[in-house]
Amino acid sequence: QVVTQMMMKAIDEINANAEGIHVTGYPNGVLGGSSDLVEGVQEGMVDIITEGPAQFASWIPKAAQVEAPYLWQSVEHMQKALNGEYKDTLNELFQQVDVRIMGSFYYGTRQLTTNKTVSTLADLKGMKIRVPQSDLYIKMVEAWGASATPMNINELYMALQTGTVDGQENPLTTFQSYKFYEVVKNVTLTNHIICPNMVFMNGDVWNGLSDHDKEVVQTAINNAITWQDEQIITAEQSLASELEGLGVTIITPDDTIREATVPYIKPSIEDWDYIQTLA
């Protein structure tokens, strides 16, 4: 996982330069699933996490907006907004739960992968699609006429293999790294979410750092995010053809999936029009 490598790079840089702290990393779900992590960072049980902001929607409903389907026009649009003025807007909200956004990074563009060919909206009817534990993602799959199954990603390979779910949606880098191509052989290039993830830090822990260590931590995270974004953008340029070499069928769908999704989702995204002005 590139995200794990990103955070280990940040940790190494912090530990090489900080004066009053030492950071230990726990990758690959060792500290629990998404719900455990987002609760843990609020309560101070975990100091720093990477997560999709939609995972905080139970406490900050507006946090889910930045993962809305078809919201971002490009990766550059997302980066400009979330590392610019919209970051300040979000940080004000996250202060309410004692969490600080340290930075946003490009997780990848989410695509649909299934156990049968999907090239149009009608093909999705009745299918069981795994999603993250997020109302926004559940609503998106409802717009497709499919059934959403929230599930921890570490349980997903087996669920795909046994047919508990018919498909899932994630960036191709995730599809590859978790080897989901071994159990589902169809990728539909829906490009439905240009997906940000964020590095979050417990507010009390941040406030307890010296000025020197604050600068070290923020610089290390910024450097790691720059590396991560470059890695994902480069990998995505060749991944479709690499997956074809592994026996995966790559499908370009018609416009019916997008046309069903945007009108269903957009009314619930308060800042949709404002975010478009940040491109």
Question: Where do the protein language model's features map onto the residues?
Answer:
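N-terminal secretory/targeting leader peptides
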Residues: 1-76, 85-86, 94-279
